[in-house]
């Protein structure tokens, strides 16, 4: 095999796949190193893509030229648009995925991808040269493989262990391998590691479930997709089911809580706040009589059911009692028991906005190693890290997505500016400009980034420009066209003469298809018209913030020279080393006075340099 590459990507999960495809797409010779080539893009937790905010991230990945949206569309077995009764800012797609098909698609695409080589192996050590640049990776039973750049995407596999009660196994998810030596290697290089935890529920053989005892979910009528490249018809919808925990479930958990590693002190890692274990729910919400449990098929044949909402680290004998206490599962046969998994992750404050590490040049990290949870968050980071690794090879500036341009920008900015001590999950509430970051306009927001970084072609970019020109032209036409008071539409909605079509379509009681029945982008134009004032207000606010993003802070700035700032501010500036005034202002504990003094210092420094020149 070749032992020299332009790039090495460690890990074949959602982050690693996006990174490998991005770098190889840009013509760089890339090695994707993974434990098991037949388990690329695994879904060890819930078999779904999308959801609030997360579905918009997948749309953004597609707009940037990534793969997750396309594969999700091809493997979808149920699709719904969430929050339809709410505003456009929080609407998002969620797809139930055939997890085996998704993994198979990833494998097939990897084999067909030019400039991309797949290798099974265990990364043991990151090698750095005397100047602090990444040099290569030591691989078990193979030796040193050299490359110019590297993206580490180890997920939950780094120095991981699985816990069920007192039964503790050193392994990755689903009894895969783990990488304790790689974790030790990063610590030796000076990286600060933290211990995190997540969990997964049991899987049940579907033919042992009594579906008559549970509620079938109402299927949505959605004809939309994550990817602009899939051109799929609406998938055949496969139902999920809803049931609940019972007082008996709660009694079993309460009586055995001392046997949960979460509460016996065995687990050191911090778990995800927004995806708690079932024992966590019972302990933290003792007054709640029941908790939702969803039965979700893992594949199109529906043979195995994922019991969403029953994540636990209880021992197997307790799990069995819990499962039998839930309606529909009285006679359940378990295919896989639930478990908690603990793993090493980096403190993301050690990263630049490009996701390159501050300690080692040309070394990038992405996904759960950076302290996030979720397939979508991982894929987004992998894509950005991959693009920026390739741009580094071209000696070009990295792409940094602004907070008003994408949830991906919010995600990365939060990580590298604020850090996280628990698995970070993207929420709509984290985005201050969420009305701008809608499900319907990801291509408008991000296609320029994709084109400028070489991820989409000129033709693809022009297609997006043409789409929004068509929308703008139609808005102009609507604004200059008046509705006859005698028309069917006017009579239907009791509209008098003198109203423009734009005014008519802006009314929430009007069906826009009555006004422009054949317009191809009905959702986009309706949202833009009806929320025009609110959108313009958020754009104005965002533009003010962007001015601070344009005020760069030199990498070599000595913060000891900055006078009249708080000691806490000086320490945080020194640790995080923000790239811009905007980023500096978002650091926790930094007050406006500190920012003013920092700006004053930079102005004085720039004036002094100008005078000297």
Curated annotation (Swiss-Prot):
Q: Which UniProt keywords apply?
A: Cytoplasm, FAD, Flavoprotein, NAD, tRNA processing
Which compartment or compartments is the protein found in? Cytoplasm
Lyase as UniProt keyword: no
Q: Biological process (GO) annotations? A: tRNA methylation; tRNA wobble uridine modification
Q: Which residues bind NAD(+)?
A: 271-285
Does Transport count among this protein's keywords?
Answer: no
Write out the GO MF terms: flavin adenine dinucleotide binding
| Cofactor(s) this protein requires | FAD
Q: Which residues bind FAD?
A: 11-16
Q: One Pfam family, please name it.
A: SAM_GIDA_C
An annotated GO cellular component? cytosol
On the tree of life, the source organism's domain of life is: Bacteria
Which Gene3D superfamilies does the UniProt record give? FAD/NAD(P)-binding domain (3.50.50.60), GidA associated domain, C-terminal subdomain (1.10.150.570)
Classification via InterPro entries: FAD/NAD-bd_sf, GIDA_C_N, MnmG, MnmG-rel, MnmG-rel_CS, MnmG_C, MnmG_C_subdom, MnmG_C_subdom_sf
Q: What does this protein do?
A: NAD-binding protein involved in the addition of a carboxymethylaminomethyl (cmnm) group at the wobble position (U34) of certain tRNAs, forming tRNA-cmnm(5)s(2)U34.
PANTHER family, per this entry?
GLUCOSE INHIBITED DIVISION PROTEIN A (PTHR11806), PROTEIN MTO1 HOMOLOG, MITOCHONDRIAL (PTHR11806:SF0)
Q: Which NCBIfam families match?
A: mnmG_gidA
**According to its UniProt record, which protein family does this protein belong to?**
Belongs to the MnmG family.
Subunit annotation: Homodimer. Heterotetramer of two MnmE and two MnmG subunits.
How is this protein named in the record?
tRNA uridine 5-carboxymethylaminomethyl modification enzyme MnmG
What species does this protein belong to?
Mycoplasmopsis agalactiae (strain NCTC 10123 / CIP 59.7 / PG2) (Mycoplasma agalactiae)
List the lineage, top down.
Bacteria, Bacillati, Mycoplasmatota, Mycoplasmoidales, Metamycoplasmataceae
């Amino acid at each position: 095999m070749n032992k020299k590459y332009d790039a090495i990507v460690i890990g074949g999960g959602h982050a690693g796949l996006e990174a490998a495809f991005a770098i190889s797409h840009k013509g760089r010779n890339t090695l994707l190193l993974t434990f098991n080539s037949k388990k690329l893009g695994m879904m060890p937790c819930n078999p779904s893509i999308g959801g609030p905010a997360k579905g918009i991230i997948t749309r953004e990945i597609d707009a940037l030229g990534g793969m997750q949206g396309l594969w999700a569309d091809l493997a979808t077995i149920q699709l719904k648009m969430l929050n339809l009764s709410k505003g456009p800012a929080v609407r998002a797609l969620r797809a139930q995925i055939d997890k085996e098909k998704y993994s198979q698609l990833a494998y097939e695409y990897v084999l067909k991808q030019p400039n991309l080589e797949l290798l099974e192996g265990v990364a043991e050590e990151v090698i750095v040269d005397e100047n602090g640049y990444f040099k290569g990776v030591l691989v078990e039973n193979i030796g040193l493989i050299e490359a110019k750049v590297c993206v580490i995407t180890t997920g939950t596999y780094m120095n991981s262990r699985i816990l069920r009660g007192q039964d503790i196994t050193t392994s990755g998810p689903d009894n895969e391998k783990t990488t304790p030596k790689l974790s030790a290697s990063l610590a030796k290089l000076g990286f600060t590691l933290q211990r995190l935890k997540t969990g997964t529920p049991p899987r049940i053989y579907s033919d042992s479930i009594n579906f008559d005892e549970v509620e079938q979910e109402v299927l949505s009528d959605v004809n939309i997709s994550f990817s602009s490249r899939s051109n799929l018809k609406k998938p055949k919808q496969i139902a999920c089911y809803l049931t609940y925990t019972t007082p008996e479930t709660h009694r079993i958990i309460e009586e055995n809580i001392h046997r949960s590693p979460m509460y016996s002190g065995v687990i050191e890692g911090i778990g995800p706040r927004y995806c708690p274990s079932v024992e966590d729910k019972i302990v933290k919400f003792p007054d709640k009589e029941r908790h939702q449990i969803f039965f979700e098929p893992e594949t199109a044949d529906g043979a195995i059911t994922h019991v969403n909402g029953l994540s636990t680290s209880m021992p197997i004998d307790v799990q069995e009692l819990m499962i039998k206490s839930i309606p529909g599962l009285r006679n359940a046969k378990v295919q896989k028991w639930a478990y908690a998994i603990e793993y090493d992750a980096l403190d993301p404050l050690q990263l630049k906005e490009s996701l390159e590490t501050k300690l080692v040049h040309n070394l990038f990290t992405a996904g759960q190693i950076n302290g996030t949870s979720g397939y979508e968050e991982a894929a987004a980071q992998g894509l950005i890290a991959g693009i920026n690794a390739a741009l580094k090879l071209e000696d070009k500036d990295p792409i940094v997505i602004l907070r008003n341009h994408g949830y991906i920008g919010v995600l990365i900015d939060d990580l590298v500016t604020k850090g996280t001590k628990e698995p970070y999950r993207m929420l709509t509430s984290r985005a201050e400009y969420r009305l701008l970051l809608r499900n319907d306009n990801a291509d408008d927001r991000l296609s320029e980034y994709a084109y400028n970084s070489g991820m989409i072609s000129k033709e693809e970019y022009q297609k997006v420009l043409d789409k929004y020109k068509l929308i703008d032209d139609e808005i102009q036409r609507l604004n200059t066209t008046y509705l006859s008071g005698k028309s069917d539409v006017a009579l239907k909605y009791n509209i008098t003469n003198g109203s423009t079509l734009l005014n008519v379509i802006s009314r929430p009681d009007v069906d826009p298809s009555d006004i422009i029945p054949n317009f191809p982008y009905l959702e986009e134009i309706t949202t833009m018209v009806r929320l025009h004032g609110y959108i313009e207000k958020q754009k104005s606010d965002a533009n003010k913030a962007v001015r601070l993003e344009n005020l760069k802070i030199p990498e070599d700035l000595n913060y000891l020279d900055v006078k009249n700032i708080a000691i806490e501010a000086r320490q945080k500036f020194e640790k995080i080393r923000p790239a811009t005034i905007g980023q500096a202002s978002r650091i926790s504990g930094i007050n406006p006075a500190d920012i003013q003094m920092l700006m004053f210092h930079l102005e004085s420094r720039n004036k002094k340099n100008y005078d000297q020149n």
